[in-house]
Amino acid sequence: MSEASCLASPLLYTNSGIHSDSFYASLIDSATHKAQLKQIHARLLVLGLQFSGFLITKLIHASSSFGDITFARQVFDDLPRPQIFPWNAIIRGYSRNNHFQDALLMYSNMQLARVSPDSFTFPHLLKACSGLSHLQMGRFVHAQVFRLGFDADVFVQNGLIALYAKCRRLGSARTVFEGLPLPERTIVSWTAIVSAYAQNGEPMEALEIFSQMRKMDVKPDWVALVSVLNAFTCLQDLKQGRSIHASVVKMGLEIEPDLLISLNTMYAKCGQVATAKILFDKMKSPNLILWNAMISGYAKNGYAREAIDMFHEMINKDVRPDTISITSAISACAQVGSLEQARSMYEYVGRSDYRDDVFISSALIDMFAKCGSVEGARLVFDRTLDRDVVVWSAMIVGYGLHGRAREAISLYRAMERGGVHPNDVTFLGLLMACNHSGMVREGWWFFNRMADHKINPQQQHYACVIDLLGRAGHLDQAYEVIKCMPVQPGVTVWGALLSACKKHRHVELGEYAAQQLFSIDPSNTGHYVQLSNLYAAARLWDRVAEVRVRMKEKGLNKDVGCSWVEVRGRLEAFRVGDKSHPRYEEIERQVEWIESRLKEGGFVANKDASLHDLNDEEAEETLCSHSERIAIAYGLISTPQGTPLRITKNLRACVNCHAATKLISKLVDREIVVRDTNRFHHFKDGVCSCGDYW
C-alpha cells in the first residue's frame, strides 16, 4: 500500500463510513499529496457526495495547488450545474497554473451557462489577461467590472493596475490607482503601481510613488522593495540602493531569493561586484537568475576572467546555462581577447542546445572578431542559417574592426539582396570599415544613406564620420558636420576632431575641441594627453609643459602602457618598464636581439615622438621598453617558430612601435596581430593590414 493510502485510509473508512461535509472539507485541507485527494474523491463518489458544490470547490482548489489542473477540471466537469464557487475555483486554478487561455475560456463558458460573476471572479480573470498581455480582453473585463459594480473592490482594482502595467498602459494603471480612496490603498495597491513604473522603464516615477507610500506610513513588503531596487539599478544610484539594502536587513528579509537577486544585480550594475559576490555566496543553492546576474555583472564591469571562471563553476555545479549565461560568457571571452578561450567557448556552444540560436551566433561572431580571427567570425556567420539583421550586422562590424572595408561593403550588398533591412549597428560597422580604410567617399555615402532607412545617427556614427573626414584632412567639413548635429556632441565626437587636428597640426581648432572635452569630462586624462600630442606635433614645447603642469595640479596621472600576449591559451601582461616577470632576463636578451636586428634592418626611431608626446607608449626614455615590444619578445621565446603572435594593448599603437612591428614580422617570419584601442593590426612580411592608416 502506498504512503498516501496509508495516510488516508484510517480517516476515510470509519465504523459508520459516513461523515459530514465539514469532516471531508477538513480532510481535503489537510491533504499533503494529490494521491490523497483522488482517494478522498473516490470516497465521495461512493457516498454520493460528488455533487456537493462545497466539497468539489475544495477539491478543485486543492488539486490546483498541487499543480494537477487536469484532475481539477475532471472534478469540475462532474458537476451537472455548477454555481459560482466552483466556477471561480477552476478559473483561479487555471490562472494560478499559468493556463491563461483556459481561464478565459472557462469564463466564456460560465457566461454561456448564465452564471453571474462576483468580485472573486475578476482578480483571476485579470491575472489571465495580464499573463497573455491581452489588452483588448482586459478592457472588456474592466468594462464588465464597472457595469456590475465591482469597480470599488480593492482586489479587482489591484488586478487592473497589474494588467495595465503588463500591457504598458501606465496612464490607465495610474488612473485606476488614483481612483482608490486613500484608506483603501493597501500595500498590494502601492506595490502594483510602483512595480508598474519600475518594470516599464520609468524609475523616477516609481521612486516618487514609493516616496508617497512611505509618507503615508505604509510599510513596504519584499515585492515593493524589489521594484524600488530595480528602479535604483536603472538609475545606477548606489547610495539609495544601499539605503534599501539596510531596510531589507532591518526587516529581516535578506534571505528572500528575489530580493537577493535584485540586490546582487543592483551592486553588480553599480560596479560593486565584490559586494555582489558576498551576497551571492550567502545563497546555499543559487538559482539560474543569480548565476546570470553574477556572470553578467562581472562581464559588464570589466572582470572578464572572473565572469568566465563563474561560468565554468556554474557548469561544474550542474546548473544548466541559458542564453543570458552563455552570451555573458561569450562577451567576457571577447574582452579577454584569447583566441584559444574563444575556440573553447565555440566548441561548448556547438555541444549545447543553443548551437542554432541566432542571438548566440551573433555574439560568437563578435567574439571571434574581437579575438583577432575574422576567419572564425565568418565561419560562424556561414554556418548560421537563419540570419537576421543582428547576425549580418555583427559580421559587418567584425570586418570594420579589422579595416576590411571591401568585405564589409560586399556583405552589406548581399544583405540588401536578401531583403534584410539594415539597422544602426549595420551602418556603424560600415562607417568603421570605411574609416579604417580611408574610404572617405564611400563612408560619406553610407552616412547619408542612413536617412533613407529612417535611422537617426547616434554619437558613435558622428564620431566615425568626423574621424573619417578629419584623418583625410577635411577638418573644416568635419567641424561643419559637428555644428549641424541635432544633439549635443559628446566626448567621442570632440575626441575624434581633436585627434584629427593633432594629425594635421591644426592647433586652433584642436584647442577648441579640447576645451569642449574639458567642459564635458574634466577629469579624463586622455583629453589632456591628446592636447599635449597636438602641441608636440606642432613643436609648441612651452604649451606641452603647460599641459603637464595642469595635469599635475589636477592630480591626473597618465595611463600606464600595458600589453598582453597569448601563449598556450594564457594571457601574460607586460607594463612599460616592468621587470617583475620571472623570465625577465630572457625577455631582456630577446628585446636586445630585436633592437639589434631592427638597426641592421634600417629602422630609425622617431625621437621627437618619444621624448615629447605625453602618450605613455611614446613617452618612455628608452624606446625598446615599450610594452608591446616586451610582449612580442616574450611571445618569440615562448612559442614555436612560425606561430602567430596575438597582442592586446590598452593604448593606441604608437608610431615607433607600429613601424618596428612591421619590420619585426619580416625579420622573424611571423604574423603578429595587435589589437589596440582603435582597431586591429595584422602585421605580416613587413606590411600592416591598416596600410599605415590608423
From Swiss-Prot:
Keywords: Repeat. This is Pentatricopeptide repeat-containing protein At3g12770. Residues 569-599 are annotated as: Type E(+) motif. GO terms for molecular function: RNA binding; zinc ion binding. The keyword Signal does not apply. Residues 600-694 are annotated as: Type DYW motif. It comes from Arabidopsis thaliana (Mouse-ear cress). PPR repeats lie at residues 52-82, 83-117, 118-152, 153-183, 186-220, 221-255, 256-286, 287-321, 322-356, 357-387, 388-422, 423-457, 458-488. InterPro entries: DYW_dom (IPR032867), E_motif (IPR046848), Pentatricopeptide_rpt (IPR002885), PPR_At4g14850-like_plant (IPR046960), TPR-like_helical_dom_sf (IPR011990). GO terms for biological process: mitochondrial mRNA modification. PROSITE patterns: PPR. Transmembrane segments: none annotated. Belongs to the PPR family. PCMP-H subfamily. Residues 493-568 are annotated as: Type E motif. GO terms for cellular component: mitochondrion. It comes from the Eukaryota. NCBIfam families: PPR (TIGR00756).
